[in-house]
Amino acid sequence: MTFILTSDVDFVSDDFLDIAYRPLKELPLTIFMTGRSEYLDKAVCENTWWETEPHPNFCAQSTHGGSISEVFSTIEQFYGDAVGFRCHKYYSSNDIEEEFANRGFSYASNICTDLVSIAPFWDRCGILQIPIFFEDGGYLKYHGVPGLDDILKRMHRDAVYVFNFHPIHLALNSCDFSTIRRLKDSMLATRYSMLSAEDARMLRNNAYGVADFLGELISYANKNNIEFLNLKQYYEKQKANRI
């Protein structure tokens, strides 16, 4: 069994990233960026087991651009030597996938399930698709607060499990999807992207929430000698074994 921890930045501030990622500093992590971040620039240099990849927004009214070419022009300013991608809201199309392949991208984690174990596969563009097993926001929306036992009973030993945690849910220890939705809707995007550590302290949920679940998941994995990888590490292993 392998656990892969991933995170979609989704335009939050560096203060929120710092709070959200503190429990993950000793673990492999794939972070999908929506823009430049001084915090991530420094953190990736300090944590060689972290990787950053682009998280482009191809949806309508995107701040990344109004067309596929405009979005790629925006994200190429911050993705560096990227090999993987995950699109905002998992938005995709044949044209988008083919453009990623033409630009040399090798893997995607752009398919989100609801606790369904789907083995990674090579798609028609030659990209390794590594589906998501658990996403915090989706689980909160449709099921409520995740409990460790509920997640574990959907797993089996010989599989890889990709988890997607958003910094907003970790920093605020979310226990209710609608609360975060109302928070986002209550302010301009510019204000949302500047929320401070003090804002996090005031808004943080003190009951059991997503951050608590992540802590239990990590403890369970460590006690049971479950392997942690980031997505790039997993891709490299699959590439080496590909016939």
Question: Which residue ranges define each predicted feature?
Answer:
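Histidine-centered catalytic micro-motifs
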Residues: 52-58
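A broadly used, surface-exposed interaction patch
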Residues: 60-72
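Conserved strand-turn element in the central/C-terminal portion of the radical SAM core barrel
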Residues: 89-90
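Terminal accessory/targeting
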Residues: 1-50, 73, 77-81, 94-106, ...
